Amino acid sequence: MLLPRWFAEALLLLLSILACSNAAFIGVNIGTDLTNMPPPSDIVTLLKSQQITHVRLYDANSHMLKAFANTSIEVMVGVTNEEILKIGRFPSAAAAWVNKNVAAYIPSTNITAIAVGSEVLTTIPHVAPILASALNNIHKALVASNLNFKVKVSSPMSMDIMPKPFPPSTSTFSPSWNTTVYQLLQFLKNTGSFFMLNAYPYYGYTTANGIFPLDYALFKQLSPVKQIVDPNTLLHYNSMFDAMVDAAYYSMEALNFSKIPVVVTETGWPSSGGSDEAAATVANAETFNTNLIKRVLNNSGPPSQPDIPINTYIYELYNEDKRSGPVSERNWGILFPNGTSVYPLSLSGGSSSAALNGSSMFCVAKADADDDKLVDGLNWACGQGRANCAAIQPGQPCYLPNDVKSHASFAFNDYYQKMKSAGGTCDFDGTAITTTRDPSYRTCAYTGSLNANATNGNFPPDALGPASPLGGNANARIIFSYHLPILAPLALTLLQLLLQHDRLL
């Protein structure tokens, strides 16, 4: 039987509400422009250990998607900016993309969203006219695969498409983009999807020339004389983050669209910058992300939409040290490329307290590494690198098996554990790799291991090298949690509507 139009619209509205009615979550963006990118399996192990349940990928990397299989972690995949033109012009290209990058992995991998491009209007404006077509073609391909209710489609937008975001109540989208934005919003409304927004208070603060105080950008409490108030609505804004999200809601209302949920697909704060980037500090980054997590997980929306939580993805998991541009561009991550924490980051109210430190990441020899190169690396680690190699001497707990890969792994790891917080890497001329799997065995405990049954012998731990200059980051903790949704009332509403419809037939 065909459902009447009113019921179809109610169903779409309910599905849209369901998509964002869960208790708010904090996710992370995973960029890959870094040296010594950890293997996907190790990244997933790390995410699971910290109870991170939502991630955004900037493409649809097959190795990453396979690693996320059977984890329940919700994955947002990306159509790259370079792929949009072809997908927008050819429905067959969209179908092929969905079949290859989404349908092939579901249900094992929990793909729940597709981000079509990133900041398309402001970075590749010549593609803007075809963006709506690309969105529709991807959605039609999902419909054909019966995945349109599970996987939502949208396109992340920059704050730059709103020229004057303050006061939020008067914010509008740039008139030059009204046609494209209107098409986007109509698509989001029709498909029950959400508006993806990249909102960076760091840039809002640094480009405002002192108009707004730093504390406002960092979620810090302002004194009564510095309170930020919208003069038109008299709504108080305790953070620039909330004002940015509300600016998006008001901009949508200006085009007669309401209740399309905003999901912040990128936000964060750089931990280091150049001489002209004074606000990019470890202290500010730690403060921003710590307060951001608390803000998002209080499960409320911005002042104009208090009942719509702000699901948010932190930018980003790793410092992408290969990125070009200002120093800050390479320092948005909460982890260094070698896996150590940039600063302590914790989430109050979570049940996990697992440490993100040396005990969760080890450095070992690659299985296919050349033995001659391993010998060179082993000699360097135990010599100039000043690793503690006493445990791999004859008669000691880690001497057997007596082969170069085993000995090199122990030496590489000891050096790595001691020096990573000071910038030491796990490379050794391409012969080493990081892993979250503890390589300890029998009575041989690798440095950083929590294996109480193994021992590295009763000898001075610094027999062949000094203690590592580990700083406060060595025991830094990052804790993420996820509150389970309470969907029963909404599900009941849907059921009641369906029963009423049946009785009318």
Swiss-Prot record:
Contains two additional disulfide bonds. A lipid is attached at A474 (GPI-anchor amidated alanine). Glycans are attached at N70, N110, N178, N256, N298, N338, N357, N453. GO terms for molecular function: glucan endo-1,3-beta-D-glucosidase activity. The keyword Signal applies. Residues 475-505 form a propeptide. One of its GO terms (biological process) is carbohydrate metabolic process. It comes from the Eukaryota. SUPFAM superfamilies: (Trans)glycosidases (SSF51445). SMART domains: X8. It is found in: Cell membrane. GO terms for cellular component: cytosol; plasma membrane; side of membrane. Keywords: Cell membrane, Disulfide bond, Glycoprotein, Glycosidase, GPI-anchor, Hydrolase, Lipoprotein, Membrane, Plant defense, Signal. The keyword Nucleotide-binding does not apply. It catalyses: Hydrolysis of (1->3)-beta-D-glucosidic linkages in (1->3)-beta-D-glucans. This is Glucan endo-1,3-beta-glucosidase 4. It comes from Arabidopsis thaliana (Mouse-ear cress). The lineage of its organism: Eukaryota, Viridiplantae, Streptophyta, Embryophyta, Tracheophyta.
